[in-house]
Amino acid sequence: MLTKTSTTIQTTSPTTNPTTVPTPGQIAVLEGVEAWSMESTPADCVRFGIFGLHNKYDIVLSGINRGVNMSGDIIYSGTMGAIFEAGNQNHKGIAFSTTPENVAASVKYLDEAFNFIMNNNLFEYSALYNVNIPEEVKGIKITKQGDAYYSDAFHQVDEVTYTQYGEMIADTCPEDKDRDTNAFYNGYISVTPMTKERTDLVAFEKLKNKNI
């Protein structure tokens, strides 16, 4: 199976899935492997791979991100933006993330997580999956998007400068074992089916008859 890779030259998290129009920035061909690097966003890498290289891919893989992508992180993540862009172009996608300190150690679990998705035919149920790998792995769980697991604050340095920081907090719904945050912090690789659809379908069904 032919594998082709395009990657951003600089880290782009948090960027979700913006694309640069009309040009995605500088593109460089890497020596010795069939791979390209780009000064652009992860979503642009996906678009270049599809439209620039004129290929149809089995699966778009994004990551490993140096930082977990759970709960509200999903909204901001460039790593997630790559698979959402894959979904926009009718491709399957998997995003992989872990803590910054665990990137090298997490590599050994990539095959395990990937094989879990493939061996259980998960793509029959969803085209996009978000995978988060903890430092100590007990197993793998199918999860859903969790609640906030850190607090946000801004610290004023001077009259015109602020710094943003956050602190880890307990899962706001610890009794819900199906959340990605609960699984991750209890030592399980979380595998969350995702969708590119942003419509609130429950509200839509209730409101669609109110048209005038």
Kindly give the residue locations of the regions a language model identified.
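Short glycine-rich anion-binding loops that position phosphate/pyrophosphate groups of nucleotides
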Residues: 41-42, 65-68, 196
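Alpha-helix C-terminal capping segments
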Residues: 49-54, 81-92
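A cross-family phosphate/adenosyl-ligand binding-site feature
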Residues: 2-49, 56
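Electrostatically charged, flexible surface regions
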Residues: 107-212
